[in-house]
Regions:
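Terminal, non-globular segments
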Residues: 1-178
Length: 178
């Protein structure tokens, strides 16, 4: 096995551990009170991964992440899997074609994606009820703001960790294909 494949397998292992931690913190009340708005950490992780990987990997990661959420979700099967997969594909494609990987680009992409995802979630779970705007403003907008904040913090940590690992761990001549 060559060095490039070893490092990609190591990245996949790190992503799996991060997904397990994000899923654990999101689905339990370890950090947040029960039935209070909490950030969608898995969505934040899908956004971050889509900034660093190609669109196929981002789509598969989004699909697996969504399937995990659909298993415990009351909204029905398939919603999170489909939306997270599309999030991975679209964000990664836009990132690779039109933007540079920096904090401003992350903000430009993640803010509309999180708002659209939260609005789609409320439409899927509640239908087209008249109280949908009130519910969005009272609960889902707070979730979106928490998700923005957690995504930005995770992005900064991820970017710093990635720079340090490339500088100290990977031998010279190894280039990540993205």
């Amino acid at each position: 096995m060559n060095n490039q494949k070893k490092y990609h397998l190591f990245d996949v292992l790190i992503y799996a551990i991060l997904l397990a931690l994000a899923f654990l913190f999101q689905s339990t009340s370890i950090l947040f009170k029960y039935n209070s708005p909490a950030p969608s950490l898995v969505l934040a992780l899908v956004l971050i991964i889509s900034f660093y990987e190609n669109y196929w990997f981002s789509a598969i990661f989004g699909l697996i992440s969504g399937i995990l959420l659909d298993i415990i979700s009351v909204n029905g099967v398939g919603f999170h899997a489909l939306t997270y997969m599309l999030t991975g594909i679209i964000c990664s494609s836009v990132m690779k074609r039109y933007l540079q990987n920096n904090f401003a680009s992350f903000a430009v992409i993640s803010i509309p994606v999180v708002i659209i995802h939260q609005f789609a979630e409320i439409l899927y779970s509640s239908g087209f009820d008249l109280g949908i705007i009130t519910l969005f403003l009272k609960y889902y907008l707070i979730v979106a703001i928490y998700t923005f904040a957690s995504a930005f913090v995770l992005y900064i940590i991820f970017r710093y960790t990635l720079k340090r690992s490339e500088r100290f761990v990977k031998p010279k001549g190894i280039i990540n294909k993205k």
